[in-house]
Curated annotation (Swiss-Prot):
The lineage of its organism: Bacteria, Pseudomonadati, Thermodesulfobacteriota, Desulfovibrionia, Desulfovibrionales. The active site is at 78 (charge relay system), 153 (charge relay system), 177 (acyl-ester intermediate). Keywords: ATP-binding, Ligase, Nucleotide-binding, Protein biosynthesis. It comes from Nitratidesulfovibrio vulgaris (strain DP4). This is Glutamyl-tRNA(Gln) amidotransferase subunit A. PANTHER family: GLUTAMYL-TRNA(GLN) AMIDOTRANSFERASE SUBUNIT A (PTHR11895:SF151), TRANSAMIDASE (PTHR11895). Allows the formation of correctly charged Gln-tRNA(Gln) through the transamidation of misacylated Glu-tRNA(Gln) in organisms which lack glutaminyl-tRNA synthetase. The reaction takes place in the presence of glutamine and ATP through an activated gamma-phospho-Glu-tRNA(Gln). Heterotrimer of A, B and C subunits.
């Protein structure tokens, strides 16, 4: 069987289980694909080639195990998740020497399920960015056009999946960082409900916003990975102790969209939305209607305020989370400091990038005496209103649908000098994180002008990923496939 990297995760899993393919063959095929594509897209920071081959050989020697749903499947992981024995930098110079001795919960679950981790993906530093240009090491490029961004902050994961370097990747989503790069790179991305997946081992950005989720080439593949990584973990006090649904069974139970009410918020379809994105997303809604869905209007009136609220809340949490990286106990230490204050200042100034420093300063400011009520408390109040908006909307619909990004992937460097414009790229994704609800991004076509992927997002009720996945699976199967990335042909 040739070109294994073109298969879906479900297909390679089944081939491995039937011993039509060896785990070593799957790993070697992905490594060959990495060798071919990596110089053009820079999606990886760390590669575990030799270790992955050894792990594959050990699996082959033991034979397939039906109790391990990802047996022999090569995957990658965003570099914000700790991996025992493999560097974990979060895309930052301040952590370039950090090699953890433990796995993140989600990584542990992957290994227990039989997955083989090929490497760690590039990302915006500490997940702060929308283009993966804020990585301290290198920018990642979009496989569909290597002169354009892949999105962020999980841009390395999205690029790896789209390029066929792996069959799935784990990303993180604090304000759209799974859904937006998935949209820009033409793959599927699932942001679970807050608390569905343990954050143990995740290098934190915004602790009340961060979630870990799968990035894959099909909705079915996302359901498979989601079934592996979801579950309670006592090491994360915010992780929900509740049963995990059989997501694969949920997909199998739905064959059309009859009876499904899809809410369309006007706030997602107004000013700033490019015509080519609007055209592709409306065509997807038409397809949903043809499949039996009922399209209803809903309102999310506080969407315009979500950007300000998000950057206040997220920056405040980041300033607290990143305070530990001072060169004393955590983080790379500046060379030959003159005194303790010089150690603090130089370690953080040399180790942290401009965008991270900008958000730390903003977060420290909004939490400072005299400004807390004016900024942070108001942002928290807006956050509550946003959750109420979603609850009111779900009283009349089952899922909410809208564009993921207002535009398709933009040229590298086009927005780096304008942070505010970069922040606006997340206008449709931020509110979901503030509400803690699940969202699924799936590709719906190529832009009529740019020729780049366009994604649509389905937003759901708390802990109702099963509905999102089943609806998304039916819809995605009715849409024409994107084909292989044009930038790598």
């Amino acid at each position: 069987m040739s070109a294994l990297h073109t298969l879906s995760l479900a297909a390679i899993r089944d081939a491995l289980a039937r011993r039509e393919v060896r785990a070593e063959d799957a790993v070697l095929d992905c490594l060959a694909r990495i060798e071919t594509t990596e110089p053009r897209i820079d999606a990886l920071l760390h590669l575990r080639a030799e270790a992955a081959i050894e792990e594959a050989r050990a699996l082959d020697a033991a034979g397939p195990d039906a109790s391990r749903p990802l047996w022999g499947v090569p995957v990658t992981v965003k570099d914000a998740l700790t991996t025992a024995g493999t560097p974990t930098t979060a895309g930052s110079r301040i952590l370039e020497d950090f090699v953890p001795f433990y796995d993140a919960f989600a990584v542990q679950r992957l290994r227990e399920a039989g997955a083989i981790i090929l490497g760690k993906n590039n990302m915006d530093e500490f997940a702060m960015g929308s283009s993966t240009e804020n990585s301290a090491y290198k920018p990642t490029r979009n496989p569909w056009d290597t002169a354009r961004v892949p999105g962020g902050s999980s841009g390395g994961s999205a690029a790896s999946v789209a390029a066929g370097q792996c069959f799935a990747s784990l990303g993180t989503d604090t304000g759209g960082s799974i859904r937006q790069p998935a949209s820009l790179c033409g793959c599927v991305g699932l942001k679970p409900t807050y608390g569905r997946v343990s954050r143990f081992g995740l290098i934190a950005y915004g602790s009340s916003l961060d979630q870990i989720g799968p990035m894959t080439r099909t909705v079915e593949d996302a359901a498979i990975v989601m079934g592996v990584i979801a579950g309670h973990d006592k090491r994360d006090s915010t992780c929900a102790d509740r049963p995990v649904e059989d997501f694969a069974a949920a997909l199998a139970s739905r064959h059309d969209l009859a009876g499904v009410r899809i809410g369309v918020p006007a706030e997602f379809w107004g000013e700033g939305l490019s015509p080519e994105v609007a055209t592709s997303c409306r065509a997807a809604l038409d397809a949903a209607r043809d499949l039996g869905a009922t399209i209803v209007d809903v309102a999310l009136p506080h969407t315009p305020q979500s950007i300000a609220a998000y950057y206040i809340v997220a920056s405040a949490e980041a300033s607290s989370n990143l305070a530990r990286y001072d060169g004393v106990r955590y983080g790379k230490r500046a060379h030959a400091p003159e005194d303790l204050m010089d150690l603090y200042v130089r370690s953080r100034s040399e180790g942290l990038g401009d965008e991270v420093q900008r958000r730390i300063m903003l977060g420290t400011y909004v939490l400072s005496s005299g400004y807390y009520d004016a900024y942070y408390r108001k942002a928290a109040q807006v956050r509550r209103r946003i959750l109420e908006d979603y609850r009111n909307a779900f009283a009349t619909c089952d899922v909410i649908c809208g564009p993921v990004s207002p535009v398709t992937a933009w040229p590298l460097g086009a927005l780096t000098a304008d942070p505010l414009q970069m922040y606006l790229m997340d206008v449709f994704t931020l509110s979901l994180n503030l509400a803690g609800l699940p969202g699924l991004s799936l590709p719906v076509g190529l832009g009529t002008e740019s020729g780049m992927p366009v994604g649509i997002q389905l937003l759901g009720r708390s802990f109702d990923e099963a509905t999102l996945l089943s609806v998304g699976n039916v819809l995605s199967r009715a849409l024409p496939p994107l084909g292989s990335p044009a930038g790598l042909r």
